[in-house]
Every structure is written in C-alpha cells, then in structure tokens.
Swiss-Prot record:
GO molecular function annotation: mRNA binding; translation activator activity; tRNA binding
Annotated keywords: Membrane, Mitochondrion, Mitochondrion inner membrane, Repeat, Transit peptide, Translation regulation, Transmembrane, Transmembrane helix
Name of encoding gene: PET309
PROSITE patterns, A to Z: PPR
Protein name: Mitochondrial COX1 translation regulator PET309
The keyword NAD appears for this protein: no
Any GO CC annotation of this UniProt entry: mitochondrial inner membrane
Cellular compartments annotated: Mitochondrion inner membrane
Length: 965
C-alpha cells in the first residue's frame, strides 16, 4: 500500500467521492449527515444492512478472471468500492457506532487468499486506526490482539513505520482511558512481535518506537508503577522479555532524569537475577553519580565485568574516584605499589591520571603517560581521557585537538564526556561553528548519546556572540527533535543568552513559562538566579526582592550563583557595598557553599568605577587571607588599583611592573593561587598600555613578549596575538612610538578579524559585544591618518563603522571632527558630523551651565523660575548628552573654519560659500555666526551686506532660513 493513501483519505468528502450508481437515495441522504451525534438505531441498521448485503470490488491480485465489462458492472451496481469503504468506516466512527465499525471492517478490510484470511493490501492507516480504536473502546481485548497480529503479519515488511504508529496510537488512547498497566503490557507484547525484542537503549535510533511511551512517562498527571508493570510482564511474558523491558525502562528513566525510579528498576533486575547488559550498568552508574552515591559506583562497576562495553561507564567511575579521594592519597597508594613489588596496572594509571587532571596537574599526568608507554602498555580510554582533560584544564586548547586524535590512533571510541570536553574546548576558543561541527558528528553517530549538557554548552556559547536566534533554535532542536527533557541547566543557559543579548524581558518570559514545572532537583535555583539577573538589568528592585522572598519561603536550596546575584543586586541597585561585604563574610564561614573570586569581583568592579583603590586592595587581602583563588579579572583590578594609586601619589610605576612580572611568573609555574593557570591577556594588556604612556614602550614590549613565552608555545603566538585585547595593546604601543606604518598594517588586520567574525555562518545576528570595540582606539587611528597625510580616508572609514553599528566614544568623535576640519578635502564632512550630532550636546551643556549660573546669581529676581532646570534636577541622566563637542574641540574647529574661509579671496565666492554652509549645516553655522568672524578677510563687507540677517540671528539666537541671508 502506498503511503499517499492516508493523505488522500484525509482530504476526501462526500461530494468529491465516486459513489456507485446503485446506492439508494435514502442511504445517500444518511451519508450526507456531517454531525457527530449517534445515529438512530433504525438508520444505523438500514445503513449497515445495505452495505453488508453488497460485496466489494475484487482485488486484481486474486485473479478472479472477470472481464473489464463485468468488473465495471459490479462497481457501478453492487460492489462496495474502496472510497465507499473508507467513507463508511469514518462515518460510523464519527457517529460512535463502534460495533458496526468493527463489523464493516471485518467484512471489507479482509480478503481470503487460499486458506488464509488476510488484510487487504489497500487498507489505509485511518481505517485500521478506527477499527482498532473501536475494538479498544468496546473492550474487546482478544480481538484487538488478533487485529494487531493481522496487521503485523500483513504490513511489517512493507509498512513497518505504519505498524508502529498504529501500536503507539492504541497505547496512547489506553493511557487516556487510564488503562495504564494494560497499556504497558500490550505495548511490550506488540513491540516484541514487531521487533523480535523489547530492548531499546538509544532514543534517536528508536525515536518512532519510543516517542509515545516516553511522553507517557513524562506526564505530570500519571504516576506509573514501573515495578508492578515488570512483575506482570515477567509473570505472563517471561523473564527474558521482562529483562529487556527493564533495560528499556532504565534507559528512559535516566534519559528523563527520574533517577529514583531508575534505581528501583535496577534493584528489581538485581533481586530477580535478570541479565545485566552494558546499558544497564551505564545507566545505574550515571544514576549513582547524579544521586551522589559515589561509594556505590566502583563496587557496582567491578561487579559486572561482562557488561563493561561502554566507555561512558569509565567516566562515571573516574568521577566517583575523584570525588572520594584526594589526589595526594591516590599518589601515595600508587607509589606504594612499587614498594611492595607490585607494578601498577593500566587501570591504576587511568584512575590516578584522571584525578590529577581534574586539579590541573598537567606535568604529573604527562609523566605518568610517558611512564606507562615506557613500560610497553597500550593506553586505555581512561588514560586518553585524562590526557585530554588535563590539557583542557590548563587552557592548552591546541594540544586538546592532537590528544583527541589519539582515540582514533588507538581505536578507542570517545565517550559522551569526551565530546563534552571538546565542546568546552571550542567554547574556550569562542568557536561556535567548530562546536556545531562536533554536534553534527555526534548526531551522525548513533552510538553516542547526545545530552542536555551538550546543548546547554552550545547555548551558553551564544552568550559571547549574543546570538539569541541560534540559542533558541538549539533549545527547540533539543526538546523537539531529540526529545530531551529540559531542566534548569538548559533553560538558565538560554535565559543568559537573552540577558547578554540585551533582551531581559524574553528571559523573564522564559522563567515564567518553565519555573512552575521544575523541581529543585531539576536546577530550579539556576532559573531563579537568571531571573534575578534579568530584573537587575531592568533595574527593577521590587521584582528582585519578590524573587528573593520566593526562594526563602519555598526553602529552595541555594548555591554559589544565588549569593553572587544577591551581591550584584546590593551593589548595582541598592549601591550598598557594606551589606554585600557582610554576605562575603558569611560565605567565608559557610560550611557547604564556598566563596569564590566571582563574589569579590562584583564589589571590585564597583570600587573600580568609583576609583576606590584602597577598597580593591583590601578585598584582595581578604581573598589571600582566606585562600580564595583569584581569577584574571581580580588580578586585572588589583594591578589597575596599584598602578593608579602609584600615579596619584606621583610615584614611579616600577612597583606595578614588578608586580605584573611576579604574577605572570608565579601563575605560569603554579605557585600563584589562581583559578586558571593561563592568565587572560587583559591581566597584562592594561598594564602594558599604562607602561607605554607613563614609562617606556620598550619595557611594555618586553612584558608582552614575556607573557607569550610563559603561556603560549611558539606556534600558538599567532593565535594569541589575533585576540582583540592583544591587538589593541599592540596598536596603542605602536601609536605611542609613532610607528605608523606598522600601526596601519595591524589596524587593517584588526578590521579583517572583525569582518571574518561577522561573515561566519553562525553570525546570523549582530554581536552587540563588538559594538564598542573601537572605543579608546579610534583617536590613534585618526592620528595615524594625519601623520601619513591620509585624512581623506577618514570619511569612508567613519561611515563604514557607523553603518555597522559600532559605538564610538565622545573622545573618538571629537578627535575625528578636529582632524576633518584641518583638511579642506574633508572639512564639509566634519561640519556634517557636528551639525547632525555634536553641536546639540554642546549647546545643551552650555544652556544648563548658563541656567545654573543665573539661578545662583543673587542680583537676579528671586521669583524667577527655570522649568528646564527643574526637569534636569528630576531626571539628570535624561539631560546629560553622551555625545557633544568638547570646549577645546569647539574652539579648534571654529579657528579652522576661520582659516578656511579666510583663504577665499573673492567676496562673491566667500558669500556663496557661507550661504552654502548655512543651507547645509544650519545648527553649526548658527553658533558660528553668533559672533563676528573678525579673523576672516572681507568679513566686514559680509556683515554689511547681510546686516538684517546677522541682527536677527544674534538677537533671537535661533536658526534662520537661508533665504534671509
């Protein structure tokens, strides 16, 4: 049967169908009824009796030998056609005549071939579904089993997907009818008939089979009794089927994170001596790790050697070992084996290497790897995983790729955890496209389980690129295509992307949609934390306090991130650093939650904005006293504080230089207590720029080279130097020593890097974090263009940056304008920028200065009111322009325009030029012409020729139409 049959059937109606000419009018009239109410018994009896008395069109395959003429005669007069059969079954089902649906189906859907009674080949999916549902509704279980058996026998080889769809439809209807135990029993029985077994351990491979059953397991209004189902199946269908179904249950329960039920199913298998397969062992180890029963992981793993065929199992074993032992004790245990004359096995190496990899002991891991190779051992999964993890932990991402290739070299299958590490490597490289390639590879390998953790990592990566569209698409792909249950992990990741993309309201909408359906085990606190972060971004203190109250009243277990949000709320919205410090004091003494660098970082950032250098230094002392590892941002703030303090006290900055060198050296050799041994470039980039300005460019270059030597191998220098923070520092260095040719080359690379990022396949939305990437840097570019006599290139560059949405600070605008006014070729472009933007901010600032001065002047009338001034007092930020002409720039461009106009000898030409400027740049020219331009030759004549214009302009101080000039 062609799959197009159901589609045709869905679209047919009474009028479009081809009815036999012999169908009586009273039957046709009945069939035109479109209602769903039950038929009266007489009408139903007449209708069914009529069709039961007729035959059906013979199948060609039967080979009845009828002539074409005879067949046509039957069709037109006495035989029931396929269309009539389909319409009749649908009609009777709609009118709830289930008994007669069965009667008609048994007569017209079946045919006899030889001694066998088989379903017809043209039986369609909707017909069969209504037939089966009618049997179910009338509780005819034996007939239902027989009908399913007939369908499997007839269509399994040609229409397996349709058969599975029918079984799942009946299963879902049984669930709706609260026949849960019977539904599960039948589903297992029928799936065994279809597949020859009932053991399914990969959702994506068996999505069609498992989709409805998984939906049943997830329903909040259903409480399945899995052990009861297993007992019934074992009793009636035998232990082999019960064991297979238990394996399926165990896999699905861990897939949807119902670990308590998964443990109960595992215990059932063990208590009833059912066979333990590889999937069972993997699932129970995963369950024990999630339930933090680490002491059971090792004993369970070693108890079932015949089931150790999945690399993921060793991941859970390694995690458990690392949680239960400190690495010093493991090292001693490992070394003791040599002492008693027993050489460590490859398993010993794997466990010890992984434990040391977790704490970033790369040298120890490499030494052990070299040692086992010298002993002629072949690396195992655990050994290779440990090597990969150790290099990831220290930020050696380039080495991660080469170590990942070792899995292929030694013919070892990477596990889910291996791919997770590689996704984290791409996250460290900020390479979303590379991460997508990993996901594509995973989706093509049915042996690898794709988890929520994989998607959460990918979604989180969208924070850096602020690509909320891709993040949302990933979330939908996870929940809809892979049918992975979302928890706080993926929801909070998506919320974070919305927040970083400046869409906090969408993050809040996500919180309101999902928070009600999550439990604390599902990471509910993570979702609350992101909601608080979103409200902080909206500066809504009341909503933040509401969420804090909800968390407290519901006694939700909090985490480190919660306290981070509380500190951020106090510092950002309440401007209460004292209370924030008291929370840090509480965390230092907390028995469960550990204080970390991110808690201190928030307060340090606030102190940095205020210029409170001593506060930053005192906070760092507190961290040192309590052995809290610093991160790169903490080191950045402390270095900046020390440097700024030295400059304020007119001291030399040698102390800062020495401090930077010490920090780099100690971080590189592992003696500095930091969260990450490879320091972020910003730690030395800011001091480097400061040294360029206040000490020696040569010293800054030495610092830069030393940083590369300590933290990057020679072949990694190029990739490190391509980072924006490093390129910015080098650009500042080159500008300070006026190496303009090199500056021009590097700036072109800087622009190319931005364009490459914008042209990546994953760059479907603009990255708002790149908008300010030219702030503080653009004035140097202007200086380079002036020095190389290329200022005529500035308008095109300026236009390009503005069109792409880059934000340039006020210093950049002023430096650009001043440069443009100095060159006759670009003066008009500079005037346009001033007229469109900067002059308005300048006038607003000076207007308020004048109003403030007048309001403070005692000689003025005391009852004089200034409404604009009062408005500014109420909303000061609203009347503070972000872009404006600085006074020195204003004076400079006025002089430059004087010089330009003074160079025009012809009075008529001068007059036309002024008129043209008034027409095109009216706001700027209004300010310019408020004072007589005495430095311009022939200006007195201009004043005399346009006396009324200047008189009105200087009196009204408002823009006048050019026609009045």
């Amino acid at each position: 049967m062609k799959r197009c049959a159901p589609a045709v059937l869905r679209n047919y109606n009474y009028k479009k169908g081809i009815w036999s000419t012999g169908v009586p009018d009273h039957i046709r009239k009945l069939l035109r009824d479109k209602s769903t109410s039950p038929l009266c018994s007489q009408d139903e009896r007449n209708l069914v009796s009529y069709f039961m008395a007729r035959g059906s069109v013979p199948l060609k395959s039967v080979g009845s030998g009828l002539t074409k003429k005879a067949t046509t005669s039957i069709t037109s007069n006495s035989a029931t056609t396929t269309f009539e059969r389909q319409y009749l079954i649908k009609y009777l089902y709609r009118h709830q005549a289930y008994g007669n649906v069965i009667k008609i189906a048994q007569k017209f859907l079946y045919t006899t071939i030889g001694s066998q009674r088989l379903l017809k080949q043209d039986a369609s999916l909707p017909e069969l579904k209504k037939f089966l549902l009618s049997l179910l509704i009338l509780q005819r279980g034996i007939q239902l089993d027989q009908a399913i058996s007939d369908i499997i026998q007839r269509f399994l080889l040609t229409q397996k997907t349709m058969v599975i769809d029918l079984i799942n439809s009946i299963f879902s209807r049984m669930v709706i009818m609260n026949m849960h135990e019977e539904a599960v029993y039948k589903w297992v029985k029928w799936m065994k008939l279809v597949n020859g077994h009932c053991e399914f351990t990969n959702y994506m491979e068996n999505k069609i089979v498992l989709r409805n059953f998984l939906s049943f397991m997830r329903q909040s209004n259903v409480r399945p009794d899995y052990l009861s189902y297993l007992k019934a199946i074992q009793l009636t269908q035998g232990p082999a089927i019960a064991s297979q179904f238990a394996t399926t249950l165990l896999f699905l329960l861990t897939y949807i994170r119902k670990f308590s039920s998964a443990e109960a199913v595992w215990n059932y298998k063990c208590e009833h001596n059912l066979p333990i397969v590889s999937s069972d062992l993997t699932c129970i180890l995963k369950t024990y790790c999630h339930m933090q029963k680490f002491n059971l992981v090792s004993s369970t793993y070693w108890k079932y050697p015949d089931a150790q065929h999945d690399q993921n199992q060793f991941d859970y074993l390694l995690v458990a070992h690392s949680r239960l032992h400190n690495w010093d004790a493991l090292q001693q245990q490992f070394n003791a084996l040599f002492g008693i004359g027993k050489l460590p096995s490859i398993q010993h190496y794997g466990i010890l290497m992984y434990t040391m990899a977790r704490i970033g002991e790369l040298d120890s891991v490499n030494k052990l790897y070299t040692q086992l190779l010298r002993r002629g051992m072949i690396p195992t999964y655990a050994v290779l995983q440990s090597l990969l993890y150790a290099h990831y932990k220290v930020g050696d991402f380039a080495a991660c790729f080469s170590h990942f290739e070792l899995f292929k070299k030694y013919d070892i299958t990477p596990s889910t955890a291996t791919h997770t590490i590689m996704l984290k490597v791409y996250r460290g490289l900020n390479d979303l496209d590379g991460a997508f390639r990993i996901l594509k590879r995973l989706s093509e390998d049915p042996s690898v389980e794709i988890t929520e953790g994989h998607f959460a990592l990918l979604i989180q990566m969208c924070c850096k690129t602020t690509n909320h569209l891709i993040a949302q698409e990933l979330f939908n792909l996870m929940t809809e295509h892979y049918n992975i249950q979302h928890t706080g992990k993926s929801i909070s990741a998506l919320m974070d992307v919305y927040i970083e993309s400046n869409r906090p309201t969408e993050a809040i909408a996500l919180f309101e949609k999902h928070s009600k359906n999550l439990s604390w085990r599902d990471g509910l606190i993570s979702v609350y934390n992101k909601a608080i972060k979103a409200y902080i971004g909206l500066r809504n203190a009341n909503k933040c306090e509401e969420l804090f109250d909800k968390i407290t009243t519901s006694k939700l277990a909090v985490n480190s991130e919660f306290y981070k949000m509380m500190i951020k709320f106090l510092v950002t919205l309440n401007e209460d650093c004292e209370t924030a410090l008291s929370i840090i004091d509480q965390l230092i003494k907390h028995s469960v939650i550990k204080v970390d660098a991110t808690h201190f970082e928030i307060i340090m950032e606030a102190y940095d904005k205020e210029g409170y250098r001593d506060g930053i230094i005192n906070l760092y002392k507190t961290m040192s006293q309590n052995k809290v590892p610093a991160n790169s941002k903490i080191l950045y703030y402390i270095l900046k504080a020390v440097a700024k303090k030295s400059l304020q006290n007119n001291e030399e900055i040698k102390e800062t230089i020495n401090m930077v060198e010490d920090i780099m050296e100690n971080a590189a050799n592992g003696t500095l207590d930091v969260t990450y041994n490879k320091l972020h470039p910003s730690v030395m980039a800011w001091p480097m720029r400061m040294i360029v300005k206040h000490d020696s460019p040569q010293r800054a270059l030495e610092l830069y080279n030393r940083y590369n030597e300590l933290f990057f191998k020679k072949h990694d220098w190029i990739s490190n130097n391509n980072k924006f923070v490093m390129m910015r520092s080098l650009l500042v260095l080159l500008a300070q020593i006026e190496q303009w040719k090199d500056f021009e080359t590097l700036f072109a690379k800087y622009m190319d890097r931005i364009e490459n990022i914008e042209n990546l396949p994953s760059s479907t939305t603009p990255n708002i974090k790149l908008r300010s990437i030219f702030s503080g840097l653009f004035p140097y570019k202007v200086s380079q263009l002036i020095a190389m006599n290329k200022i005529d290139e500035l308008p095109l560059l300026w236009k390009k940056l503005r069109e792409k949405g880059f934000i340039l600070d006020n210093i950049s605008w002023n430096s650009a304008v001043e440069a443009l006014f100095k060159d006759p070729r670009t003066l008009s472009y500079g005037m346009k920028i001033v007229d469109d933007t900067l002059i308005h901010g300048y006038n607003l600032i000076h207007k308020f200065r004048l109003l403030t001065k007048l309001s403070e002047d005692k000689t003025q009338s005391s009852d004089k009111s200034w409404p604009t001034l009062k408005m500014k007092e109420k909303e000061p930020n609203k009347f503070q322009p972000r872009l404006y002409l600085k006074s020195d720039t204003y004076n400079s461009i006025m002089r430059q325009l004087d010089t330009y106009l003074d160079g025009i000898d012809d009075l008529k030409t001068l007059e036309d030029q002024v008129r043209d400027f008034i027409s095109n740049y009216k706001y700027f020219m209004k300010d310019y012409l408020l004072m007589p331009r005495s430095k311009i030759n022939k200006w007195e004549q201009i004043e005399m020729r346009h006396l009324s214009y200047f008189k009105e302009l200087r009196k009204s101080k408002r823009v006048l139409p050019v026609s009045k000039f």
